[in-house]
């Protein structure tokens, strides 16, 4: 069973230490609920990932662990076969001992769009909400973050993250917790909170923004990336059924409305730093994610529309600062 003891130890003398009052029981319950299903099989795969300390580790410019020269061809093929058990790999890419995991998403492109605009992560305690397999967490660590915590309820994403971490070395100050944000208390402790690709999946986007705010210290920075549509501060799209074949998309605001939501939730210094239409080169099927992808979600006769006739995916990144709490909003 995946252990969280090293995380408990790392936060015992940090700004997150009061989380220890509730977190062990919550994760203990999660472990009991996942004794069956695919998780035990995946954990057996993780236990086979015993490899020499990597001669190269780079999280600054990519996520690269090992040059590829340390393993024989047979060892590398064995590692590739083990990593393939965790398909589909959606967020990446990763270079692991010479194995190039070409994921569905070029998450490095998103990171390069975002990182020039955020406050430096050096020595900051960072939370990544809806972190997926953790690609951006490693890049946050590469920017010098003191602690990086990612939360996502998916057991598969957790195992993908753990596979990378075991190859990188378990002593890294980076941890994945299989939780949704609604399971977190109001920690008021993180210097930076990222929520990228989550808001449009939430039935109540305002509640989600409040939950994000509750994790930040006063003066902390929110990095919020989500799907948007064109329009003014009165514009929002709620799909009648599916959007891009997804049945869990609820609200797509305009940039102006999104900024209004943040202002209403008592954030300050609110600014849009990037708007980008998702390209077919950024999200596509690969051997590591052989299922349907963006091209299958768009109108084959007009890629500016989804198959349902809505505007094709466009993503905005908003940065904002947590203000002093307004008692009228609590």
Curated annotation (Swiss-Prot):
It catalyses: carboxy-S-adenosyl-L-methionine + 5-hydroxyuridine(34) in tRNA = 5-carboxymethoxyuridine(34) in tRNA + S-adenosyl-L-homocysteine + H(+). SUPFAM superfamilies: S-adenosyl-L-methionine-dependent methyltransferases (SSF53335). Homotetramer. The keyword Membrane does not apply. InterPro entries: CmoB, Mo5U34_MeTrfas-like, SAM-dependent_MTases_sf. HAMAP family: tRNA_carboxymethyltr_CmoB (MF_01590). It comes from the Bacteria. GO terms for biological process: tRNA wobble uridine modification. It comes from Shewanella halifaxensis (strain HAW-EB4). Its EC number is 2.5.1.-. GO terms for molecular function: methyltransferase activity; transferase activity, transferring alkyl or aryl (other than methyl) groups. NCBIfam families: PRK15068.1 (NF011650), tRNA 5-methoxyuridine(34)/uridine 5-oxyacetic acid(34) synthase CmoB (TIGR00452). It is an enzyme of class 2 (transferase). Gene3D superfamilies: Vaccinia Virus protein VP39. The gene is cmoB. Carboxy-S-adenosyl-L-methionine binds at residues 91, 105, 110, 130, 152-154, 181-182, 196, 200, 315. Catalyzes carboxymethyl transfer from carboxy-S-adenosyl-L-methionine (Cx-SAM) to 5-hydroxyuridine (ho5U) to form 5-carboxymethoxyuridine (cmo5U) at position 34 in tRNAs. This is tRNA U34 carboxymethyltransferase. Belongs to the class I-like SAM-binding methyltransferase superfamily. CmoB family. Keywords: Transferase, tRNA processing.
């Amino acid at each position: 069973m995946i252990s969280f003891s090293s995380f408990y130890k790392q936060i015992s003398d940090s700004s997150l230490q009061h989380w220890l009052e509730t977190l062990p029981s919550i994760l203990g319950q999660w472990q009991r609920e996942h004794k069956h299903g695919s998780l035990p099989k995946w954990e057996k795969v993780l236990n086979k990932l015993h490899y020499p300390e990597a001669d190269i580790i780079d999280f600054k410019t990519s996520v690269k662990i090992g040059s590829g020269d340390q393993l024989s061809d047979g060892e590398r093929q064995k590692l590739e076969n083990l990593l393939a058990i965790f398909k589909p790999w959606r967020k990446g890419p990763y270079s692991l001992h010479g194995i190039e995991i070409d994921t569905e998403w070029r998450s490095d492109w998103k990171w390069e769009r975002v990182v020039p605009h955020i406050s430096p992560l050096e020595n900051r305690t960072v939370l990544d909400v809806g972190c997926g397999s953790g690609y951006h967490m490693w890049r946050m660590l590469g920017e010098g973050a003191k602690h990086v915590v990612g939360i996502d309820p998916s057991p598969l994403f957790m195992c993908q993250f753990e596979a990378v971490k075991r190859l990188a070395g378990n002593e890294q100050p980076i941890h994945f917790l299989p939780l949704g944000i609604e399971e977190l208390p109001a920690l008021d402790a993180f210097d930076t909170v990222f929520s990228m690709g989550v808001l449009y999946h939430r039935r109540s986007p305002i509640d989600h923004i409040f939950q994000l705010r509750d994790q930040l210290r006063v003066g902390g920075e929110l990095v919020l990336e989500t799907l948007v549509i064109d329009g003014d501060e009165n514009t929002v799209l709620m799909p009648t059924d599916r959007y891009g074949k997804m049945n869990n998309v609820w609200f797509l605001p305009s940039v102006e409305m999104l900024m209004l939501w943040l202002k209403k939730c008592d954030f300050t210094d609110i600014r849009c730093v990037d708007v980008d239409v998702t390209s077919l080169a950024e999200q596509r099927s690969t051997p590591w994610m052989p299922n349907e992808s963006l091209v299958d979600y768009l109108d084959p006769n007009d890629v500016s529309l989804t198959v349902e006739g809505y505007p094709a995916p466009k993503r905005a990144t908003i940065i904002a600062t947590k203000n002093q709490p307004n008692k009228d909003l609590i």
